[in-house]
Amino acid sequence: MVICHSCTTFCILLVIDLVPCRIVGMENVENRVMFSLLDRSPQTNDTGPKPEKFEIAKGKFKVLEENSIGADTVSHLPTTREEHVSAVVPMPNFDPHRLEKALRTKGSIDGTEEALYRSLLDHTVYEKDVRPCIHHSQPTNVTFGFLLNQIVEMDERNQALTTRSWLNINWMDPRLSWNESLWSDIKAIYIPHARIWKPDIILVNNAIREYYASLVSTDVMVTSDGNVTWLFSALFRSSCPIRVRYYPFDDQQCDLKFASWSHDITEINLGLNTDKGDLSSYMNNSEFDLVDMTAVREVVRFPSDTNSDWPTIVIRIHMHRRPLFYVFNHIVPCVLISSMAVLGFLMPPETGEKINMIITTLLSMGVYLQSITESIPPTSEGVPLIGMYYVSSLLMVCLATCVNVITLNMHRNGAANQGRHVPAWMQKWILGYLATFMRMSIREPDSIALLKASQSKKSTIRRSSILRDLKRVKNMSNVRAKSKEQNANRECECMDPLVHIYAESIMTSLVSDPKPMNGSTIREDFASESTFLGRVVSDGIMPRISASSNSVLTEFETRFRRILKRVYRSLQQHEIREEILDERSRIQWQWQQLASVVDRLLLCLFCTATLFTIICLLIVPVVYRDNDVLSILNFF
């Protein structure tokens, strides 16, 4: 001990002696300076005066030539600069009293713990690669403790759970025990974990390549009876099979399996200090709620090694997902998009945007389905509820597109088929019973009813009027024939007002309906007769009729009668055409009403299907997930 103390003192003096000092009188000279050592006054005898402190020697510095490392000291020729006396100036903060106090404290330090550390870890008596045991046939009992600090991440796509945990591993090492009375009542010491033996306990279901890089270990605490406690923190990434059936309303149970990698139960007996994990320092996760955590000891026998049992500590972490994020970002948009597809049945077909709206809805559903598939694991073991709901919604939107095409064709069926009548069974069941059940009143519009009534009344009046006028003309010709001899010399200067009425009515009808009905021949006849009547009307008088002009009267009556017949025929054809157009309008209106009733029926059906899908795929499975009612889902 005295020798060690002397060596320590000499080293301290040497360090102090080599402290840089300022050199006086050596400006602009780049040379190396040799420092003088501290001189200690020699102690001649025990009775002589003892120096109370160390003094710094004073002297001149010897200057070495530049680039003369390792060479002997060379004296310079006397110059004027050497005449200046160089002095060693100590550091400003140097205190000789503090140095003396430090040396005295060093001499009074107790080295018992250091000596105990060296004696325990002496390589002649301790080998860290050898398993500690009293006899090699006895196992080393290792106690395992687990503290969960945080659930960092659940990677559903890669099926891995990342947790931050603290481990407490304890075992007995008889080689590290000592007698407290012989070592100043030292009860425990701390030793670096790399200096002693440690059990090779690892995470069996590890899912990361750099396993040991995530371990943060502290010093190992060793007590006097050989009890070793190893505390360390780690960021574990373990494989965890994800159950996606009820995603995003799912519960996940992940296991962390710890075991010795190379020692079976005959060498390392791994046990638990408690069956409940420590949650005193747990930090809540934003995505999962921790339901429960248990620790179980299992003894595993592998098929490849049936003669050995391997103790394993299984930490089961039960978590429940918080579905609020997924409800607002995945489910609510899907419900709204499905509702927009259903509301497409209420859009009038005349707008021509029903199909565009449903196709846009279908594309939106596809985009949201793609975002779902990127977040759930690509597994075929089960289909998540949200995926089933999206597929069902896509199917309903596709069906809505198909039935909207059918209803649009039905709406245009009356105009496309040139007046094809609605089948009788459709009129009876759809326009009759189904419309009544849907609380829809099928009545002809007032315009069609009034038009039909007016056309029918007008046709009756015209026909009776023409027949009456034809009879009147015939009677008039007979009367004129009888009185021809009596009025032979009388001249008729004015035309009968009835003829004016007939002529004006004929001209009005010809002007209002100039289209021919019977080809070019009828058009030529009407042209000649209209010229004749126009001349009669423009002149305002009949040609002078005398006894010698019977042929003119006969010609006029013949032409006039022929014109009336053709006018009657044209009016009749015009009425028939109007009746055909009215009938087509009525048929087209019936098809439109039929399409409206079908749209109302499909609206009710798709609303019911949408609500039924939400209840069956999103509500019932979450509420009754533990009942046998949902066993049908296992079929998929």
From Swiss-Prot:
Disulfide bonds join C240-C254. It comes from Caenorhabditis briggsae. Keywords: Cell membrane, Disulfide bond, Glycoprotein, Ion channel, Ion transport, Ligand-gated ion channel, Membrane, Postsynaptic cell membrane, Receptor, Signal, Synapse, Transmembrane, Transmembrane helix, Transport. One of its GO terms (biological process) is monoatomic ion transmembrane transport. Its main location: membrane. This is Ligand-gated ion channel 4. It is a multi-pass membrane protein. Glycans are attached at N45, N141, N179, N227, N284. Residues 26-326 are extracellular. One of its GO terms (cellular component) is neuron projection. Residues 1-25 form the signal peptide. PANTHER family: NEUROTRANSMITTER GATED ION CHANNEL. Acetylcholine receptor. The keyword Glycoprotein applies. Belongs to the ligand-gated ion channel (TC 1.A.9) family. It holds the Pfam family Neur_chan_LBD. InterPro entries: Neur_chan_lig-bd, Neur_chan_lig-bd_sf, Neur_channel, Neuro-gated_channel_TM_sf, Neuro_actylchol_rec, Neurotrans-gated_channel_TM, Neurotransmitter_ion_chnl_CS, Nicotinic_acetylcholine_rcpt. It comes from the Eukaryota. It is found in: Postsynaptic cell membrane; Cell membrane. The chain crosses the membrane at residues 327-347, 357-377, 383-403, 603-623. One of its GO terms (molecular function) is transmitter-gated monoatomic ion channel activity involved in regulation of postsynaptic membrane potential. The gene is lgc-4. Residues 404-602 are cytoplasmic. CDD domains: LGIC_ECD_nAChR (cd18997), LGIC_TM_cation (cd19051). SUPFAM superfamilies: Neurotransmitter-gated ion-channel transmembrane pore (SSF90112), Nicotinic receptor ligand binding domain-like (SSF63712).
